[in-house]
UniProtKB/Swiss-Prot annotation:
Region feature (Disordered): 42-129, 191-307
GO MF term set: peptidyl-prolyl cis-trans isomerase activity
Pfam families: FKBP_C, NPL
Keyword Isomerase listed: yes
Main location, first listed in the record: nucleus
Reactions catalysed, as given in the entry: [protein]-peptidylproline (omega=180) = [protein]-peptidylproline (omega=0)
Keyword rRNA-binding appears in the UniProt entry: no
Record function comment: PPIases accelerate the folding of proteins. It catalyzes the cis-trans isomerization of proline imidic peptide bonds in oligopeptides.
Cellular localisation: Nucleus, Nucleolus
Organism annotation: Eremothecium gossypii (strain ATCC 10895 / CBS 109.51 / FGSC 9923 / NRRL Y-1056)
PANTHER family, alphabetized: 39 KDA FK506-BINDING NUCLEAR PROTEIN (PTHR43811:SF19), FKBP-TYPE PEPTIDYL-PROLYL CIS-TRANS ISOMERASE FKPA (PTHR43811)
Name of the protein: FK506-binding protein 3
Length: 417
């Protein structure tokens, strides 16, 4: 098969529900379509997928009409030759009767053949959510009466090429040389042609299409009727689909309600369990209660006044409660509860509940004042330790602790290993 030769780019925009001829009657050139693409901008709020349809006049339908017309003309000519009317008046009556019969026959035939006059084909269904474009390979000749219609909410653009059909040259050659003899020499400046040569007779050839052809091609009533039929069909399909989806939606709603109830029960059980666990944890958690005088400072009673000792670097210790058991020495792991205060009495840190603060005594894991002040305590013992700035954080400022601050700690030894 010979290839089609592209001559120029072909583009056509099709608006929804607006029949558009495939080929401009003023440019009778063969067209090859290669691509259909959707414009993603919706022209309405429904956002229906765009379905591209091809509507073509049935060639067989036209052939039948031509044959019937030819046969009717021949019969009329024969009848006119056989019998000529004697007067003009009967002739007018006969002509009127014949025209009425022809009109009635045409109406009957149009009613019977309206469905067969046009053929409809779906080329593609496009949507911005699923498919933006579709490749095509469709060739349309000028002789075909083809229109495109788009149903949906989006504009569709067709692209391709105007092409030169391999048989176009042969057809034009045969038409140009009609009327020449067997020895026609039209290619040699018409030498050898007879007097009746029609090579130069351009007056009989007219590129402008007949008005009847244009009217047949753009028969708006037929095309609009077809479009209305398509729209009604789509609406019926959507209504049926909605009726089918409605019971599904009701079932889904019931299922969601059941799932919500189940989730609510699970959440309630989980909350109850969390509350029980919290109560158990509260019972298990060991809380160390400091004596009132440990937080408030030394007792005001003269008889219970704690003994004060000054240790290395000016670290001062006051034993409030003497513990029992062996004393803490360097290298022992001690668990402490404590309240840390500045010289003005402001609390900057404390550990009075939960997991005790554990460190290895005398190994520099805490400030130097703690290594000195905690040494010698027994489990259950309570002590106040006053630490000068040099044995605390010195010139370093920390959150809540200014630089060069003297620190006071009320501590209790809760474990010793």
């Amino acid at each position: 098969m010979s290839e089609l030769l592209p001559m120029a780019t072909y583009n056509l925009n099709i608006e929804p529900y607006s029949p558009t001829p495939a080929i401009d009657v003023t440019v009778p050139v063969t067209v090859r379509l290669t691509m259909a693409a959707i414009d993603p901008e919706s022209l309405d709020d429904e956002k229906k997928p765009a379905t591209l349809r091809l509507i073509r006049r049935n060639p067989a339908f036209d052939d039948e009409d031509d044959l019937l017309a030819d046969s009717e003309e021949e019969e009329e000519e024969e009848s006119e030759e056989e019998s000529e009317p004697e007067t003009k008046k009967p002739k007018k009556k006969a002509a009127k009767a014949e025209s009425e019969e022809e009109d009635s026959e045409e109406e009957d035939s149009e009613g019977e053949d309206s469905d067969d006059e046009f053929e409809e084909f779906v080329l593609a269904t496009l949507s911005p959510e699923s498919q933006y474009q579709q490749t095509l390979d469709l060739v349309i000749s000028p002789e075909e009466e083809v229109q495109f219609v788009v149903t949906g909410s989006y504009r569709v653009s067709l692209s391709g090429n105007y092409v030169q059909h391999p048989y176009d040259d042969e057809d034009s050659y045969d038409e140009d040389h009609e009327g020449c003899g067997e020895n026609c020499a039209c290619d040699d400046d018409h030498e050898g042609c007879g007097d009746d040569c029609a090579c130069d007779d351009d007056s009989d050839y007219d590129l402008t299409p007949d008005e009847e052809d244009i009217l047949d091609m753009e028969d708006a009533s037929d095309v609009e009727a077809k479009i209305e039929e398509l729209v009604e069909q789509e609406e019926a399909n959507e209504k049926r689909k909605a009726d089918e989806d409605e019971p599904k939606a009701a079932k889904k709603q019931k299922k969601d309600q059941k799932d919500t109830k189940k989730d609510a029960k699970k959440d309630a059980k989980k909350d109850q369990k969390d509350q029980k666990d919290a109560k158990k944890d509260a019972k298990k958690e060991k809380k160390v209660e400091f004596k009132k005088d440990l937080e408030e400072g030394p007792s005001k009673k003269k008889d219970d006044k704690p003994k004060t000792k000054i240790l290395e670097g000016g670290v001062v210790i006051e034993d409030r409660v003497v513990g029992s058991g062996k004393a803490a020495k360097k290298g022992a792991r001690v668990g402490m509860r404590y309240i840390g205060k500045l010289k003005n009495g402001k609390v900057f840190d404390k550990n009075t509940s939960g997991k005790p603060f554990v460190f290895k005594l005398g190994h520099g894991e805490v400030i130097k004042g703690w290594d000195i002040g905690v040494a010698g305590m027994a489990v259950g013992g309570e002590r106040r330790i006053v630490i000068p700035a040099a044995y605390a954080y010195g010139k370093q400022a920390l959150p809540g602790i200014p630089a060069n601050s003297e620190l006071t700690f009320d501590v209790k030894l809760v474990s010793l290993k």
